[in-house]
């Protein structure tokens, strides 16, 4: 009986480890995708706030629970996320944007985006801080945390570089 419990705990620990690693890999891929979208947004001259919103929309699938409520007070579902994304991108003010879409990892600067012109290139970076699971999965997941975040946070960074042709045309 004890052996069965030990084996069950071992398999559950292995499952949670693989689940956490897969979730972090998915979030890392979405950060890379978001960085590419932010770099494209910067090439057409969008400001920093629009680049940040572009990163938010690109990382919706890995942004944690949705905090926006619908008209009846319930949480907004996946189909509503997709239909609300254009309205979110059109918002001018942050308070208005949070009424349309708001996720856990968008709050408190957990998902940030930046783009800068470097010579003839635009380099975009998307950073997302995500909480790590504690317990056996944390032993195998590697170091977690950074100087700015909680010690239980993992920092995922996505970067992209795109050639900037607009300086040639706008001179």
List PLM regions with ranges.
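Alpha-helical assembly-interface signal, strongest on the long, hydrophobic N-terminal helix that forms
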Residues: 1-68
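Short, conserved structural patches
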Residues: 44-171
């Amino acid at each position: 009986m004890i052996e069965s419990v030990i084996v069950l705990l071992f398999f559950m620990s292995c499952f949670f480890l693989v689940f956490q690693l897969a979730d972090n890999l998915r979030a890392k891929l979405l950060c890379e995708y978001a960085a590419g979208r932010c770099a494209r947004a910067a090439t057409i001259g969008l400001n920093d706030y629009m680049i940040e919103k572009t990163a938010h929309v690109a990382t919706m699938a890995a942004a944690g629970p949705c905090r926006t409520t619908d008209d009846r007070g319930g949480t907004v579902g996946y189909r509503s996320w997709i239909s609300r994304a254009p309205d979110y991108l059109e918002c001018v003010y942050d308070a208005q944007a949070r009424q349309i879409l708001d996720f856990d990892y968008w709050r408190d600067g957990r998902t940030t985006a930046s783009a800068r012109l470097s010579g003839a290139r635009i380099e975009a970076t998307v950073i997302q801080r995500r909480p790590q699971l504690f317990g056996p999965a944390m032993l195998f997941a590697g170091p977690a945390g950074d100087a700015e975040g909680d010690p239980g946070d993992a920092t995922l960074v996505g970067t992209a570089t795109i050639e900037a042709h607009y300086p040639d045309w706008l001179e």
